[in-house]
């Protein structure tokens, strides 16, 4: 059996101020405190390796956990957050330009042939999640800690449940239902070809 501990990255100023994140957005002061809290939690949880998204906010969270617990760490773009168009990154979500882009993305979320620029649509995100799950299954480690992002982790859970059958309406409903705090811990197990969600959104380490 393989156990995968998923941790969402710590908070950023973008999270706190309603701004679309940049790839290089670092943790805020609050996010660094959250990362330290979850790192202490893993003093009591044996883990073979830390795999983290290479986006700065996740990489910083993963590095904090790995350094405190003397664990090997791998930075993997497979576990990045859903990619938004470059034009909105760094913008507040309530600007006219961002609202118009949000409308465009919503209208074309399920259209595999239409994109504004370099963003991911539903099909891109699903295929990357399926690839990430296959990668985790193939790794030799039995206990893995993955530091990733809220929307991508939701898609991972959907793909664990339904694989290629995940549909846009199904994902959208689950995405709004599965609330995830910054640095919250979720645990999944893989055994005999099947995934099981054991713990979701455990943030007791934050007090």
Where do the language-model regions lie?
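Active-site-adjacent alpha-helix immediately C-terminal to a catalytic or transition-state-stabilizing loop
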Residues: 131-194
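Acidic, His/Gly-rich catalytic cores of divalent-metal-dependent hydrolytic chemistry
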Residues: 194-207
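Extreme N-terminal starter segment of soluble prokaryotic enzymes
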Residues: 1-5
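Short glycine/proline- and acidic residue-enriched helix-loop micro-motifs
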Residues: 102-124
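Phosphate-coordination/substrate-recognition cap region in phosphate-metabolizing enzymes
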Residues: 37-110, 181
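Loop-to-helix element that buttresses phosphate recognition and phosphoryl-transfer chemistry
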Residues: 8-64, 118-130
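Short aromatic-enriched loop/helix-cap "lid" or pocket-rim segments at secondary-structure transitions
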Residues: 16-19, 85-89, 158-160
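Short, well-ordered beta-to-alpha junction loops that form the rim of enzyme active sites
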Residues: 54-55, 78, 146-151, 200
């Amino acid at each position: 059996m393989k156990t995968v501990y998923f941790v969402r990255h710590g908070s950023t100023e973008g999270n706190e101020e309603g701004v679309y994140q940049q790839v290089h957005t670092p943790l805020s002061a609050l996010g660094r405190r959250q990362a330290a809290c979850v790192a202490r939690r893993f003093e009591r949880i044996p883990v073979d390796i830390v795999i983290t998204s290479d986006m700065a906010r996740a990489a910083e969270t993963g590095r904090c956990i790995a350094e405190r617990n003397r664990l090997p760490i791998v930075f993997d773009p497979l576990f990045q957050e859903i990619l938004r168009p470059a034009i909105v990154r760094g913008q507040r979500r309530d600007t006219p330009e961002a609202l118009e882009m949000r409308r465009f993305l919503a209208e074309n979320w399920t259209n595999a042939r239409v994109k504004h620029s370099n963003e991911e649509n539903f099909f891109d995100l699903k295929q990357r999640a399926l690839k990430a799950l296959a990668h985790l299954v193939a790794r030799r480690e039995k206990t893995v800690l993955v530091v990733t992002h809220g929307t991508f982790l939701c898609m991972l859970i959907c793909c664990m449940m339904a694989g290629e059958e995940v549909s846009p309406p199904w994902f959208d409903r689950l995405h709004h239902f599965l609330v995830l705090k910054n640095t919250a811990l979720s645990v999944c197990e893989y055994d005999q070809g099947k995934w099981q969600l054991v713990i979701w959104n455990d943030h007791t380490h934050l007090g």
